[in-house]
């Protein structure tokens, strides 16, 4: 299967004038839901797929004979505005980079992500994501469609009423979804930080306002609390067990475990992060220990029938453009069937 063929098709369509149909022929067309057609033509008009013809039209606009075309990939967990600064370190507000430099870096991140075949991402963690989302949406800069949570809600001291207010403030400011922290970082052990009641208040308000809630949760206890609270999606889950995965199945909760990219990126670029916040010797040791656990959880999740398994990488500074790495990890290390991995990354 050729990811490149899919990418070229997407870029070709994006570069066409608004008027007039574009026809894309490929020897194999995947629908993102498990089905496929051989020797088919995708017909696109004004940026929208009109139909798929089960034959080769005369003189297609783009001919990918021998290649595969599939829907654009979706990464449900990135940090689009996180980048490495001029000193080769993770950008922080105090590193001297100007807003213009930060903006160009964010645009470069998005372009790299698009070139990797990802046409939709959820960027969950920064207010700056909103401007990037809007610029891409207007066609001013190339990049994937962005959904953003703006700033995450991470303060465990907030009351239920305050959490509802925080959710409402973000939605009113243009958030497409809400991100909550129900546990500590993996670098700090991943223990639960918010109660089920707090999560119910926040996730309930998000649902009332018509946006999904995505919860950072590593420990089994924090995952269980978020699922029972009715939250829409769990991210990470390094310490998830069969009990909480089965609970997610029963409750219809979406689950986005990271197979390895986020941890490997931090470890491979240790000197770029070390000394910032919880990027300590202990923090790096915790991430190294997390890799086999994350692969095992991904394997368990992939083998669990009925689980709403989505695809998210937690791509941060240094990882943009490598978003497909975890697809390979899911298939090669976690044993997920290739078509199931594609479905998770295109249709859910």
Task: Label each PLM-derived region with a short phrase.
Residues 81-103, 111, 142-143, 147, ...:
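Active-site gating loops and adjacent loop-to-helix segments of metal-dependent hydrolytic enzymes
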Residues 64-138, 197, 221, 226-229:
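Metal-associated gating/positioning segment near the N- to mid-region
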Residues 162-182, 189-255, 269-272, 276-277, ...:
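Histidine/acidic residue-rich metal-binding segments in metalloenzymes
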Residues 103-129, 143-153, 175-185, 212, ...:
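Divalent metal-dependent hydrolysis catalytic cores, especially in the metallo-beta-lactamase
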Residues 20, 29, 33-70:
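Histidine-rich, glycine-flanked metal-binding segment
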Residues 4-21:
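Bacterial Sec-dependent signal peptides at the C-terminal "C-region" and cleavage site
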Residues 208, 279-282, 290-348:
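His/Asp/Glu-enriched, well-ordered alpha-helical/loop segment
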Residues 81-84, 121-131, 184-188, 218-224, ...:
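Active-site environment of divalent metal-dependent phosphoester hydrolases
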């Amino acid at each position: 299967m050729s990811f490149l063929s899919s990418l070229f098709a997407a870029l070709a369509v994006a570069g066409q004038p608004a008027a007039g149909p574009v026809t894309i022929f490929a020897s194999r067309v995947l629908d993102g839901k498990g089905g496929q057609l051989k020797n088919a033509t995708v017909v696109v008009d004004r940026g929208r797929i009109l139909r798929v013809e089960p034959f080769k039209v005369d003189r297609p606009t783009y001919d990918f004979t021998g290649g595969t075309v599939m829907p654009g990939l979706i990464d449900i967990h990135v940090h689009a505005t996180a980048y490495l600064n001029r000193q080769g370190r993770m950008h922080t507000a105090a590193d001297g980079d100007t807003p213009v430099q930060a903006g160009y870096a964010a645009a470069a991140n998005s372009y790299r992500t698009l070139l990797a075949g990802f046409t939709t991402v959820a960027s969950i963690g920064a207010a700056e994501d909103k401007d990037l989302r809007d610029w891409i949406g207007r066609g001013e800069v190339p990049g994937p469609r962005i959904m953003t949570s703006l700033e995450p809600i991470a303060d465990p001291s907030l009351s239920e009423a305050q959490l509802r207010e925080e959710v409402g403030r973000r939605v009113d400011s243009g958030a497409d979804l809400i991100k909550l922290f129900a546990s500590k970082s993996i670098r700090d052990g991943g223990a639960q930080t918010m109660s089920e009641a707090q999560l119910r208040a926040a996730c309930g308000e998000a649902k009332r306002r018509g946006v999904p809630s995505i919860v950072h949760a590593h420990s089994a206890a924090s995952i269980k609390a978020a699922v029972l609270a009715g939250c829409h999606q769990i991210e990470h889950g390094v310490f998830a067990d069969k009990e909480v995965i089965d609970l997610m199945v029963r409750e219809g909760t979406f689950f986005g475990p990271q197979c390895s990219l986020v941890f490997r990126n931090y470890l491979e670029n240790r000197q770029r992060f070390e000394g910032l916040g919880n990027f300590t010797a202990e923090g790096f040791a915790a991430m190294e220990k997390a890799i086999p656990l994350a692969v095992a959880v991904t394997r368990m999740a992939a083998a669990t029938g009925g689980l709403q398994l989505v695809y998210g990488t937690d791509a941060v500074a240094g990882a943009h453009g490598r978003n497909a790495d975890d697809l390979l990890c899911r298939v090669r290390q976690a044993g997920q069937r290739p078509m199931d991995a594609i479905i998770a990354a295109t249709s859910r």
